Amino acid sequence: MPKPVVAVVGRPNVGKSTFFNYLVGKRISIVEDTPGVTRDRIYAEVEWRNKKFTLIDTGGIEPYSEDKIMQQMKRQAEIAIETADIIIFMVDVKDGVTASDKEVATLLRKTKKPVIVAVNKVDKIGELPADFYEFYNLGFGELMAISSIHGLGMGDLLDEIFKYFPEEDAEDYDEDVIKVAVVGKPNVGKSSLINRILGEERVIVSDIPGTTRDAIDTFVENEHGKFVFIDTAGIRRQSKINEKIEKYSIIRSWTAIERADVCLILIDAKEGVTEQDTKIAGYAHEQGKASIIVVNKWDLIEKQTGTLEEYRRTVHEKLGFMLYAPVIFISALTGQRVDRIYGLIKHVADQAAMRISTGVLNDLLNEATAMVQPPSDKGKRLKIYYMTQSSVKPPSFVLFINNMELMHYSYERYLENQLRKSFGFEGTPIKFILREKEKE
C-alpha cells in the first residue's frame, strides 16, 4: 500500500517551508522572509502515530517571479490537485484573507479531494484573533489554527489529516502476478515503452483501477507469466499541467515504486545518468525493489566496437549502489530488444523471491570467513556465529555476531559478493540484519 501524499498549498510567505521543516524535523527547505525562496528539496516522509505519509511543499515548484504571482499560485494548486490525496491550504492570520488566497481557494474548490485550511502564525491557540474567523469565507468548513514556527496546533492538524487517509486495503492481485513500475525522469520515453510493450504483444491486456487515486493499472498475461504495469494512465498522460513542474512526476514515481515488485528504471541514452535518475534509482534501492536499468533511445547513439560495454560500465559507475541491476539497451521507438524485457522482469522477480536454506548458507559463511578473516579492532575480532534468511523481496539475512561495532561495511559487502557469486540474486538488493548473540 503506497503512503498517502499530502500537499501544502498557499501563496508565498505564509509559512509553508517552516511548517514542512517542523514536521520533517530537519531543516530541508531554505527558509527566508523573501517570497519564493523554497528551491531545495520539496518532499519528505513524515511519521505520526505510527503512520507514514509523503509531504510535499509546493513552494518548491519554481523560483518566484513577481510578474507571474497568480500563475505561480495556480500552478501550485493544480499540482496539489493532480498529485495529492489530501491538500493543506495554508493562509496567514496576520495578513487576513488576500486576493491571492481567494484565487487559490477558487481553484481548490474544483477538486473532489479533501482540503484542510491551516491558519498559520496564530501565537495563542486558546485566544484566536478576530481576523481568524474571516477565513471561513473561503468556504472549506472547519479551520485549523497553527503556528509553524512554535509548533502549536500541529498535533490537531495531523489528526485531522489522518481522518482523510485512504483505508489500508491490501493489493488485490494474486501472488503470481508481478507488479512492474516503469519509472524515469520526464521525456525519457516511459509512455513510448509502455505502449510498445503492451502493443507488440498478442496478449490479454486490460485496464483496471489502481489502488492509488486516479491510477490505472494494466494487466498483461503472456508466455512469461502474469504482469501488472502500475499507473499506466499517469505515464501515458504525462503531465497535463506544465512542463516546468514536471519535477512532480518524481512523486508519482515513488508511489509506483512502493507498490512494485520490479522497477524498470529508464535512462536516456543521449543524456546518460542524470541527478534525477540517481534519485529515482536510489529510492528503488532504498525500498528494496528488484530493478532493471533500461537505457532507451539506443538507436540515437553512434556505435563502434565496445560502445555498449563501455556505456554499461559508465552506468554502473554512476549508479554504484545498484551494481546488481542488469542493464538492457533498447529503443522504444524501433522496438529494438523490447521483446527481452518480459523475460528479464520474470528473472529478477524470481531472484528477489529466492530462499536459501540455513544449512547451505552456513556452509558458505564458513568458507567465506576462512578465505577472508572477519575484521578486528583493538585486539577484538568479529565473530559471526551463523546466518539465516529472514525474508524475501528483497532477500534479507540475519547475521548473529559477537559485537556490532566490529562489523565493517566493507566486510558486509564481501559477504554480499559471496552470496551473489554462489546464488545469483541478480537484479535485487540484499539486506543484512545484525544481531548480537546474547552472552552466555
Curated annotation (Swiss-Prot):
GTP 1 binds at residues 10-17, 57-61, 120-123. Pfam families: KH_dom-like, MMR_HSR1. PROSITE patterns: G_ENGA (PS51712). Residues 4-169, 178-353 form the EngA-type G domain. GO terms for biological process: ribosome biogenesis. GTP 2 binds at residues 184-191, 231-235, 296-299. GO terms for molecular function: GTP binding; ribosome binding. Residues 354-438 form the KH-like domain. Keywords: GTP-binding, Nucleotide-binding, Repeat, Ribosome biogenesis. HAMAP family: GTPase_Der (MF_00195). Belongs to the TRAFAC class TrmE-Era-EngA-EngB-Septin-like GTPase superfamily. EngA (Der) GTPase family. Associates with the 50S ribosomal subunit. GTPase that plays an essential role in the late steps of ribosome biogenesis. This is GTPase Der. It comes from Acetivibrio thermocellus (strain ATCC 27405 / DSM 1237 / JCM 9322 / NBRC 103400 / NCIMB 10682 / NRRL B-4536 / VPI 7372).
